[in-house]
Every structure is written in structure tokens, then in C-alpha cells.
Amino acid sequence: MTVQPLRSAPPSDLVIDGVPAIPDTILQGTAPYWKIDENFFMGWEPKTNAMLIDSMGKETRQVHILKSPEGESTLTTAFPENIAGASFMPQIGSPIVFAADHYGDEFYQLYSLDPITGQTQLLTDGDSRNDGTVYDHTGKQIAFLSTMSGGRYEVIYVMNPRDPDSRRVIMTPENDGWLVEDWAHDGGHILALHLTWYAGYLWSINTTSGETRLLTNTPETQKYFLEARYTPDDKGIFGLVLGVHGVITIEYLPLENNGPIRKVPPNVFDALDMELSPDGVWMAYVTGKKETQTLHVFNTITGEEQPKIPLAPALFARLRWTEDNTQLGFNYGSAAMPFQAYSYNVQTRQVTQWTHTDISSLPTAQVKPELIKMRSFDELEISGYLYRPDPQKFPGKRPVVISIHGGPSAEYVPEYLGAYNYYLDTLGVALFYPNVRGSTGFGARFASLDDGLKREDSVKDIGAVLDWIATDPRLDSSRVGIQGGSYGGYMTLATLFHYGNRVRCGSDMMGFTDFVTLLRNTKKWWQPSARRELGDERVPEMNKFLEGISPLNHAADIHDPLMITAGKSDPRVPASESDQMVKAMRAQNGIIWYMLGEEEGHGFHRATDAQYQFAAETYFFETYLLPEKRVTPLAPESITTVPAKFGTPAPTGPD
């Protein structure tokens, strides 16, 4: 990764409002952490078994070709925007098809790239959103989801990437939640997955006529599929299936009564990912929970499993086989190690690391998070991961920053902290990452416990976290900060007005401030999902409830310093959500730091923007969290008596 020299002046595309000049000690002190780059395996070149690698370029993430392990990579794309996904065409190789948006607006366009000449061609219309690209097994066609038709939902297209004019619609869904999973090997059908709250339906779509067939339409086959792949003879499907209590198994679904019987790994109840080799003989799959995942390779013909792969349990992602069926590529990382590209050879049974980043010079190279469990207000068990600074270097009770993930349908799993290791190494600040109710990974019931009128129960879970912090003799409950992005940004604001007397300050990144204005103004392709998750503001009773719990309507109750970060091109949480909160806070003379990225979306992705935002946020916490005494912008008595407002009247009706 190329790290640009940090300057005291912000990058030209950042609009700064109320953020003081950042000391050089912070700008330069945080810089080494940005030199630690994660290199992600994306796929294989089908003829040479070279790897496609996603690495940070000068400002944005770009595609590189790596011909041999630990070798010199060749920059393949030099695009002004981040590359969101790329792959060689199966069997054929060239061209590479990749996706990129504009300033983080998530209106991804598809491009083809000749890796020899560097010539790039736009494959889509330049205005729509296109994603979910899946390649057929011959390398002649791709299937993808797109809004090009102008309808409310994404439709499914197929196209020959060598001929953009060949693109055509094969299915127009009447709802959202559709994914393209695989192509039949004869090219005649596409395997599509329709995800709802209650089931994952598998459909077969004829690529010529568009005729659809529901594959899981009987009691025997009515299963919640999460992922699926055709067998090479197209007579069956392997899939990940979600069962009761969060159990995930690997199952085989025959499509013909007289089809061959394929074997699946026995006694697997915690599968997380799977991928078939092109010949269908080998299945790679990942099992485990949280940070203790294990990679396996299984023979679907003999039912035999390869010997244990010599890698410590950690995190695995993006399993992909070479066309010759001999090597499995994947990404491997942990809390102590950034993701890097690896391969496993099924013939030699050898693991090879292809990319490397040296972290030995950083003090937190061996940091190990602690899994903390606690009871919430209703005795529900919640959990989170705590990173502590070195007690020898930082004795006594340490300040804490609680960092809340977005979603809420997501889960925090201990990954490499990146620049946030600076908090542990230099500031001596502990970091706590909770998984409150509504998080995934703990079963369907847990994920539903913040639905509808129970939305603020997840905020009460943060109250339980604050209670637990007060019981730990090594943590300072009088110096707690809070931060979060997207839904975690909303949670940050909600915590500030419910528990303002128990936290010092908060940093909201791309968080929404009013449920109703968010649901009205978010992009149309995101609206159905947002309404399903957060509530439908068009229903009068729900509208009233959402207005009652929106942070914007409680701005007068926020008395702690607040930093807000927004992206002008954000399609999910419009920057207007942040603007209206800043205006409300300014009206009451609160301390508010505001940063708007004019070339950013739902997160800061340009290198210099991300570095400057992180340095500013670090300075914010250094200013308002570290001092022994609270820095108070408003009357101290108003802070110490702020009550929790969980008495907000809720409408009556079914839960």
C-alpha cells in the first residue's frame, strides 16, 4: 500500500465544520498503521493459475495480478474509483470483468478489461446499479442484477461481456431479495436464490425463455437455503441450509429421481461457506463460530475428507478453485493478522501464502480479544469482544470506546483492527465491540428481538454493556466513549440521549438521525430492505413510533460532545440525515465536529480521506475521553440528570 504524506490541512474534497486543526503528533503517529494493508484474493487466471489480488493503490483499491506466491504483483487496473469486484472469465481468461461505482454512490457499473492492452470497455449503461455478477462455466456469458429497466426492483440480465449489446432481461422479479447463485453447466438455466425473512427459495430460470421453476416447493424440500451450487451434471444441487436454533448444514438436493447420489460432509452443524471444484469432486467448506473457523476439503464422490489443513482456526473468506481442480484459493486472517491470500493444493496437501504484510514492528501484533458475555435488562444473554491495552504500559483503569456495528443484521467477528490498534498502543484506550440483539449469528429469534416496537431494546443492551464495564476493575466507567457507523451511528446517537450521563462523547459515522426521513429519502433500491428491517413509515402507527425514538427529535437531550461523519454520495443514509442533526445541535450550542466527504459514500474509502477522518476522530476522543474530568459544553447539572427515555409511548398493535 502506498501511504501519502499526511498534512495538517484536510484533503480538498473534505468539508470541515467545527473540527479543529489536528496535531502533527496524531497525523504522523497514526500513519504507520495505514501502511499495513490487507491483500484479498479475488480469483484465478484459468490458464496459468495466477491470482487476482485486491490491494490498495495510491488512493483506491485496485486489481493486481500475482503470478507466483510472494512474487511481484502487476497493477492491472488504474481506475479512479475503488474496484468492487473482479474476475477472469472461466476457461477463457481474458477479459477481466470488474465493477466500480462513482464517489461511493453504489451505482456500480460493469466493465471489461483486456489485461494485456489495458483497454477498458463499459458494459452497462453508466447510470444504473449493477451487481451480483456470476459467470457461466464456459466463460462466454455473465448473469447479473440491474436497475437498468427502471423498475422498482433489480431485474436479472444475461450478457456476453465481449458484446455489451447482447445484454437482455431473463427475469423481472416482483420483489427484492434475489441473488444469482450459479449457472447450469449446459448454460440453459440459472440457479437463483430468493431470500425472505422466513425462507431461502431456490429457483431455476431458463436463460432462453425466462421460464421459472421453483425447486424448493414441497414440504420435503422447503428449506432455508443460504447458498447453492449445481453439480457438474446439473442433476443436483449442493447448498448451505439454515435450520432451527441457527444450525447450518450442508445438504444435497437431487433434481432427478434417478440421479447419482452425492455425499455431503457428515455431522456438520456450523457451516459458514462452501465451494465446489469445477469437476464437482472436491468441496471446500468452512465451519466454526466467530474467530475460530476451520477450513475443510471433502471428496463428494468417496465421502472422504482430506487430512486437517495446517492452519490455525481463524477467519476464512472467498473460496475459489482453479480450473484444473488442484488448488483452492482463499483469504485468511484474524484479530492479530490482516487478511492475506492463500492457497491449498489437494494433491500435495500444501498450504501456500501468496501475499504478505509485515506487522512485526507494531506492539499489538499479538493482541487477543476477550469474549465477554453478560445479561441485559430482560436476562437475555448478549456478548461482545474486548480489546485491552497492555497493562504493563498502561496500568490502572483504562478508558473505553464502545464500537457498535451496522446492520443491524450483521455480526462483529474479531478481525484485524487496523488503525484502531493506535488506540491500544498509544492512547491506552480499551475497545469493546458488542453484538446487541438484532445481530445475526445468534439464531433467528435473537435477530428478531429488535423488530418493530422493540427497536429500543437494543439500545438498552448498551445500558447492560455500561453496567458490565462498571464491574470490571481494569476499566474506567467514568470515561466511556461510543462510536458506530450506519445503524451503529443511530445507536450511538440513541445512547447519547438515553445514557448521556454515563458516556463522555460519541462519534456517529453515516448514521441516520430520523427514521422517517431516512426511509423516505434513501435510494429506491434500498427502500424495501430498509422498511422491512426498520419499520414502514407509511403506516401511521409505526410512523408515530419511529418519530418518537428518532435521535433528531431528542437533540435537546444530547449534552455530550459529538462528531458526525457523512458522505455526500451515500445512497443508503443520505447526507441530509447528518446535516439536520448538526443544525439541531448547533441550535443548542453543543460541541459538534462535522466532516463531509464530497467524494465519499457510505463510508470513507479513499486513502487520504480515510486517514484524515481517522486522525480527526482520534483527536476527538483524545480531547473529550482521555481527560480525568469531563469536558462539558453545556451546564453540568443538565448532564448528570439526563434520564433514560424508554418511556416513549408506543402505538398499540400486533408485535
Language model: regions and residue ranges:
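Generic beta-strand/beta-sheet core signal
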Residues: L193, I205, L240, L253, ...
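Conserved beta-propeller blade repeats
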Residues: K35-D54, P80-A99, L110, D127-M148, ...
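Beta-propeller blade-edge and WD-like acidic-aromatic loop motif
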Residues: A9-L27, M56-L75, S94-P95, A99-L122, ...
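Active-site-proximal cap/loop segments of hydrolase catalytic domains
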Residues: T426, Y433-D655
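N-terminal pre-domain segments of enzymes
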Residues: T2-E38, P633-D655
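Flexible loop/turn segments at secondary-structure boundaries
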Residues: A199-G200, Q222, H245-I248, A271, ...
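Short, solvent-exposed loop/turn and secondary-structure capping segments
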Residues: F107-Q109, E154-V155, T249, Q340, ...
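Cap/lid segment of the alpha/beta-hydrolase catalytic domain
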Residues: Q350, T355-S478, Q483-S486, R520-P528
